[in-house]
Swiss-Prot record:
Residues 678-951 form the Protein kinase domain. Residues 1-20 form the signal peptide. Its EC number is 2.7.11.1. It comes from the Eukaryota. Gene3D superfamilies: Phosphorylase Kinase, domain 1, Ribonuclease Inhibitor, Transferase(Phosphotransferase) domain 1. PROSITE patterns: LRR, PROTEIN_KINASE_ATP, PROTEIN_KINASE_DOM. It comes from Arabidopsis thaliana. GO terms for molecular function: ATP binding; protein serine kinase activity; protein serine/threonine kinase activity. GO terms for cellular component: plasma membrane. GO terms for biological process: regulation of cell division; root development. This is Probable LRR receptor-like serine/threonine-protein kinase IRK. SMART domains: LRR_TYP. Autophosphorylated.
Length: 964
């Protein structure tokens, strides 16, 4: 019996340790599972949390003590969790760190959290949607707490006075909530605090004097509250302070001189208060300062000369005060300045020349020579709303890092320096409301990062420089109230990001470029009080433009001003290219005749009659000959005959042999009947939509005429003319220009500019001796130019459908121009069978979706054709080549070579190795990406342009490549 009792005791004592370990482990698992049940986990970040697990130590976001296996840390930052913080956490008795920041948690914070979890040292619940108030006893047992962040929530009420119990607290962040009332005095007894952030709340009352107790404080942020009264001088006792932000309160009085004791302070922000007095000279003793912001206060007097002692200063903001006098020359000593803002004061004197000089001499030299200075690192310079005079120094171009230049509302004179074009990072230039004169320098286009250009209310004259087209990021262009002359440059339409344009109150003349209607982001457009005339562009912002935006231009017409435009008919064909056509009386007026009638003598009339008789005879004989030959000989040329006089100018006649010819330029048209023939001897080539002939107009000016062979499919005359006129408005440096068109019911012609360089196909595959003269740089520029053109077409909602090397033409200087664009718009419906039959000559270029009726045809079919073209240009091979017993598809061949690491072997051997291999291989990879079988996997053409620019200029500078 006794032995059995001893055995039982030993057994219980042996099992007891095991039983003592099991329940706590189960408590941790149970607590976390209960906590998870209150959450929504859209990204399945808590999928590893399994209630059947013996221990949670391997769960995502959970960390345990290595010896006891108890949960000590729970870190679920940024898990996209939503729901509430449930009671399950209270089971984690050994938890040291709880971090749930950057989620979408809502509800209240459990008032017993800190009471139950007495081992907590770090609590971070910031950046959630927690609400409610904290009860007074919330902090009653927080002696172990070292870090507490409840920032960026929706907490309200007063900060509990029990905060004083957190005797070990080193960092307290309650910012960006709705806490109100005064700051509890208990905070100022936490002498372990290193960081205190109560900013962006609704705290009120005076700044406590007991701040001197926080002698370990390094960072203090009480900004954006309602604090009032003076800044206590006791703040100088916190000698370890490095950052102080008391901005956006209602603090008053002068700066306490104890600030100068804060030798470690590198950031002092007191902006947007009611502080007054002079900026003290002792400010120069705070030599560690990198940021000094006293803006939007009531400071007066001059900027102290001691400011030059702050050699580490990076940001100096004294804006919005009542400072007077000139800018001290010692400021030039602050060679590390990145931002200088003195706007909104009453500073006077000439604009210091040292501001715009990249000098290196010290202040002693500056006192004798104001032409040098040292703030060459400056990024933002704002001296606006002062009374500075003088000129902007030419040394402005030395400030290569400048991003914002604000000199508006001063009394500056002289020209805008041409060196403005050297500021490649400049995004804002505002020199408005001054007395600047001269012209807008054409070098302005060199500031390629410009987003905002404000030059209004000056005395500027001359033209708006077309080089402004290079500022492709420009959003705001304000040039009003100047003396600008000339016309509005059509290049403005290339600034596709423009949102605001104001050219009012100038001397501009001419018509408005129609392309401005394509600016999709434009919401403000003002051209009032100029000398502009003609019809307003149709579409875009111009459909809802306010009449006041165009007032003061008597010649403007259109629906906006409720004034119809005079119907000026197309000019008829005349033999004298120097003559003009009077649209009001239908007469041809020779040069120098003005509006006078020409009186013909009798001998002249006889001569004209005789000539007319001869012409009639010749025509009669010609007609007879043609009738005889018509049955046996096919025509070798198609004569173009036109209705004469007023009939031509209005509409085609009912005679099928008469037609309507319109030249968009308005210039006189065909010079002789012979040149108006589509002679087969002058045929340049044939495609799916018709043949192309070369002919001459306007005293030997060559053009290319495409005779459409889809007459049975072409739309009606009205639809045809409407679509062709849209195509005629397209303008791009890499687009073949459409000069005009000709229409009859049986014959339709499109008249293009003639390009002497021939097609890319001939340059690649039909060069004499098989030796193409295209260098690698030529080929890269052709690829880039083609890409930019297609991007422009897609931006204009036009799909090419037929991109291939024979449709890429070269001008005399080798620049590529894309032709045959928009022809599919002339078909009555974009039927894929019709399209595929018309572009069947583009074998190898056709995107695979043409063969699948369930896939929508988009601009990605052009991307596919472009990709094939890229590979063709780089390799010099045709898209499809037929061998004796095989067919080689270029895309497949190159893709296989790339996978085998032999991409460089595909490059055209005619280049003889004279090309950068890495660049060529990168271009090949782009071509293969563009030829993806899945349309959505192909890039947009705009993306392709950017990729090409990055390939050529990896550093990010694409100046040498131009802009689209």
């Amino acid at each position: 019996m006794y032995k059995a009792l001893i055995f039982t005791v030993l057994l219980v004592s042996a099992v007891a340790p095991v039983r003592s370990l099991d329940p706590p482990l189960n408590d941790d698992v149970l607590g976390l599972i209960v906590f998870k049940a209150d959450l929504r986990d859209p990204e399945q970040k808590l999928a590893s949390w399994n209630e059947d697990d013996y221990t949670p130590c391997s769960w995502n976001g959970v960390k345990c003590h290595p010896r006891t296996n108890r949960v000590t840390e729970l870190n679920l930052d940024g898990f996209s969790l939503s729901g509430r913080i449930g009671r399950g956490l209270l089971q984690l008795q050994f938890l040291h760190k709880l971090s749930l920041s950057n989620n979408n948690l809502t509800g209240i914070i459990n008032p017993n959290m800190l009471l139950s979890l007495v081992n907590l040292k770090v609590v971070d619940l910031s950046s959630n949607g927690l609400s409610g108030s904290l009860p007074d006893e919330f902090f009653r047992q927080c002696g172990s707490l070292r870090v507490l962040s409840l920032a960026k929530n929706k907490l309200t009420g007063k900060i509990p006075v029990s905060i004083s119990s957190c005797s070990s607290l080193a960092a307290l962040n309650l910012s960006s909530n709705g806490f109100s009332g005064s700051m509890p005095l208990g905070i100022w007894s936490l002498n372990t605090l290193r960081s205190l952030d109560l900013s962006r709340n609704e705290l009120e009352g005076e700044f406590p004097e007991k701040i001197d107790r926080l002698n370990n404080l390094r960072a203090l942020d009480l900004s954006r509250n309602r604090l009032s009264g003076p800044i206590p001088s006791e703040i100088g006792s916190c000698m370890l302070l490095k950052t102080i932000d008391l901005s956006e309160n209602s603090l008053s009085g002068s700066l306490p001189n104890t600030f100068q004791q804060l030798s470690l302070c590198y950031s002092l922000n007191l902006g947007k208060n009611a502080l007054e007095g002079e900026v003290p000279k002792w400010i120069g003793e705070m030599r560690s300062l990198e940021t000094l912001d006293l803006s939007m206060n009531k400071f007066s007097g001059q900027v102290p000369d001691s400011i030059g002692n702050l050699l580490a200063l990076k940001v100096l903001n004294f804006s919005g005060n009542g400072l007077i006098g000139s800018l001290p020359v010692s400021t030039a000593n602050c060679i590390n300045l990145l931002a200088l803002d003195l706007s909104g004061n009453s500073l006077t004197g000439k604009l210091p020349m040292w501001l715009f000089q990249d000098g290196s001499r010290d202040v002693s030299a500056l006192k004798n020579d104001n032409s040098t200075g040292g703030i060459k690192k400056i990024q933002v310079l704002d001296l606006s709303h002062n009374a500075f005079s003088g000129e902007i120094g030419a040394g402005l171009g030395d400030l290569r890092d400048l991003e914002g230049l604000h000199l508006s509302r001063n009394s500056l004179t002289g020209p805008i320096p041409s060196t403005i074009g050297e500021l490649k990072h400049l995004s804002v230039l505002d020199v408005s409301h001054n007395q600047l004169n001269g012209m807008i320098p054409r070098e302005t286009g060199g500031a390629v990062s410009l987003e905002e250009l404000r030059l209004e209310n000056n005395l500027l004259e001359g033209n708006i420089p077309s080089s402004i087209k290079n500022c492709s990021s420009l959003r705001s262009l304000i040039l009003s109230h100047n003396k600008l002359l000339g016309s509005i440059p059509p290049e403005l339409a290339k600034l596709t990001r423009l949102e605001e344009v104001d050219l009012s109150f100038n001397e501009l003349a001419g018509t408005l470029p129609k392309q401005l209607a394509n600016l999709g982001y434009l919401h403000t457009f003002n051209i009032s009080h100029n000398h502009l005339f003609g019809e307003l562009p149709a579409g875009g912002i111009f459909n809802g433009l306010s009449p006041s935006s165009v007032s003061g231009n008597p010649g403007i017409c259109g629906a906006v001003v409720n004034k119809s435009c005079p119907a000026i008919s197309p000019k008829p064909i005349v033999l004298n290219p120097n003559a003009t056509f009077d649209p009001y009386n239908g007469e041809i007026v020779p040069p120098g005749a003005g509006h006078k009638r020409i009186l013909l003598s009798i001998s002249s009339l006889i001569a004209i009659s005789a000539a007319a008789a001869i012409v009639v005879g010749v025509i009669a004989i010609t007609v007879l000959n043609l009738r005889v030959r018509a049955s046996t000989v096919s025509r070798s040329a198609v004569p173009l005959t036109f209705s004469g006089g007023d009939d031509f100018s209005r509409s085609p006649t009912t005679d099928s042999n008469s037609g309507k010819l319109v030249m968009f330029s308005g210039e006189p048209d065909f010079s002789t009947g012979t040149h108006a023939l589509l002679n087969k001897d002058c045929e340049l080539g044939r495609g799916g939509f018709g043949a192309v002939y070369r002919t001459v107009i306007r005293d030997g000016y060559p053009v290319a005429i495409k005779k459409l062979t889809v007459s049975s499919l072409v739309k009606s005359q009205d639809e045809f003319e409407r679509e062709v006129k849209k195509l005629g408005k397209l303008r791009h440096s890499n687009l073949v220009k459409l000069e005009g068109y000709y229409w009859t019911t049986s014959l339709q012609l499109l008249i293009y500019e003639f390009l002497s360089g021939g097609s890319l196909y001939k340059q690649l595959h039909e060069a004499p001796g098989g030796n193409s003269s295209l260098s690698w740089n030529d080929r890269f520029n052709i690829i880039l130019g083609t890409a930019k053109c297609l991007a422009y077409l897609h931006q204009s909602n036009i799909i090419h459908y037929n991109i291939k090397s024979s449709n890429v033409l070269l001008d005399s200087s080798g620049e590529p121009k894309v032709g045959d664009y928009g022809l599919a718009r002339l078909l009555p419906m974009l039927d894929r069978y019709v399209l595929s039959s018309k572009i069947q000559s583009a074998l190898g270029y056709m995107a695979p979706e043409f063969a699948c009726r369930t896939v929508k045809i988009t601009e990605k079919c052009d991307v596919y054709g472009f990709g094939v073209l890229v590979l063709e240009v780089v390799t010099g091979k045709k898209p499809v080549e037929y061998m004796e017993d095989d067919v080689v598809v270029l895309c497949d061949m190159v893709r296989e070579a790339l996978e085998d690491g032999r991409a460089d072997e595909c490059i055209d051997p005619r280049l003889q190795g004279k090309f950068p291999v890495e660049e060529a291989v990168a271009v090949i990879k782009l071509g293969l990406i563009c030829t993806s079988q899945v349309p959505s996997s192909r890039p947009h053409m705009g993306e392709a342009v950017n990729i090409l620019r990055m390939i050529r200029c990896p550093s990010g500078s694409s100046d040498e490549l131009g802009s689209s």
